[in-house]
C-alpha cells in the first residue's frame, strides 16, 4: 500500500514532504485480512498481526518513513510513502478498500475493519485518498477492546475530521 502525500497539508523540504506531529491521539481505521478469524495480517504486505491477549492491542512502531521514487501520474501525485503504518481517516474509505481487498483475495480470506489510534506525538502524513501513514499505530482486536483501552495513552482519541477542526493544519511541526 502506498500513500500519495497531500501537499496541501505538508511543507516540502529538500524535495520531501515534512511529517506532521500529532498534538492529540487520533482515531483511525485499519483494514486487516484473515483466513480463520483469529490470525490477522495486512493486505499486500502480509505482515502478521498478533493481538495482545490482555488488552487486545497490536503496536506498530516505525522509526523511519520511506518514499518511492518521485513520479507524476495523471492525478499528479509526486510523493509516495511506502513504509509507515497505513490506515484510513474514516470508516467509509476503510469500507471501500475492505471490499476492494476482498475482491482481490477471493473467497479464501475475509477482511475486517479495526479501530486504531495514532498516539499523541507520532509523526504522520496525510494522503489524497482519506488515508494516513504514521510512525506509530495501535490497532485494536475489536470495538470492545477499543472502548476498554482507548484512554491507554492518557488522552481521548478524536476523529480525524475533529482533529483538523481543532488543530487545523498547523504546519509548524518539525
List each model region and its residues.
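Conserved NAD+-utilizing ADP-ribose enzyme module
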Residues: 1-85, 91-174
Amino acid at each position: 500500500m502506498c500513500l500519495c502525500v497531500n501537499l496541501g497539508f505538508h511543507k516540502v523540504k529538500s524535495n520531501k514532504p515534512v511529517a506532521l506531529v500529532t498534538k492529540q491521539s487520533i482515531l483511525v481505521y485499519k483494514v486487516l485480512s484473515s483466513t480463520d478469524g483469529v490470525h490477522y495480517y495486512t493486505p499486500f504486505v502480509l505482515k502478521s498481526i498478533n493481538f495482545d491477549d490482555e488488552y487486545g492491542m497490536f503496536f506498530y512502531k516505525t522509526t523511519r518513513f520511506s518514499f518511492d521514487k518521485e513520479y507524476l501520474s495523471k492525478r499528479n501525485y509526486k510523493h509516495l510513502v511506502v513504509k509507515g503504518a497505513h490506515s484510513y481517516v474514516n470508516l467509509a474509505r476503510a469500507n471501500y478498500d475492505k471490499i476492494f481487498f476482498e475482491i482481490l483475495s477471493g473467497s479464501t480470506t475475509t477482511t475486517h475493519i479495526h479501530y486504531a489510534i495514532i498516539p499523541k506525538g507520532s509523526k504522520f502524513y496525510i494522503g489524497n485518498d482519506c488515508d494516513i501513514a504514521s510512525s506509530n499505530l495501535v490497532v485494536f482486536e475489536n470495538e470492545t477492546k477499543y472502548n476498554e483501552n482507548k484512554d491507554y495513552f492518557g488522552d481521548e482519541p478524536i476523529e480525524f475530521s475533529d482533529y483538523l477542526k481543532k488543530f487545523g493544519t498547523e504546519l509548524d511541526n518539525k
